[in-house]
Amino acid sequence: MTIEWIVIRGSGLVAFGLVAASTIWGLMVSTKLFGRAIKAKPLTWFHESLGLGALVATGVHMVALTMDQYVEFGWVDVLVPGVASWEPTAVALGVTSFYGLAVVTLSFYVKGLIGQKVWRTIHFLAFGTFVGALIHGILAGTDTTNPIVTGMYVGSGVLVVGLLILRITMQRATPTVPPRSRTAASRGPVTDPSPAVPVGSGD
C-alpha cells in the first residue's frame, strides 16, 4: 500500500463526508430547524466552509489519483467524464459531481451578481452532486464494505432523503398568498371614489 493510495482513500472519504455534511446542513437551514437560536450569517458561513472544504479535499483526491502508479490516471481521466478506462461509470459520476460541487460552492461568491432566484436554482445541483458522490464512493471506493464507511453512506443518504421530504412537506403546508392579494392587503381597503347617487335622482 503506497502513500499515494492512502491519500486517495483518505481524501475521497473526507470529500464525501464534507459533501454530505454540506447538503444536510443546507437542508437543515432551509427547513428552519434551528429556528432563531442561531443567526443566519454563522449558519451560511458554516455551510460555505463545508462546501469549500469538500472542494479542496476533492482536489487533493484528484491530484493523488494522477500520482498513483496502480491505475495510472491521467489529467484527462480525472477531468473529463467517461474517459477513464477503470470503472468508467463510477469515475464519470465522480468527475461530474466535482463540477457540480464547484459551481454550487463558488455561487456563494457571486450571489450578489446573479440574484437570489438564480442562486437558489443553482443550489438544486447540490442534490445531484450528493447522489453522484454517493454512487461514486460505493462503486469505486475500496472501503465500501467497511462497516464505518457503509454506515456513513447509509446514514447520510437517510438523512438527506428525510430532510428533503420534511422540506417538501413544510412547503406544501405553508399557505401561499397570491401577489395581487398581498398588494391589495398592503394598500388597505379599497373604497369607491365615485360619489353616491341617490336612488331616483334621475327622475
Give the location of each predicted region.
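Membrane-embedded alpha-helical bundles that constitute the cytochrome b-like, heme-associated redox core
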Residues: 1-203
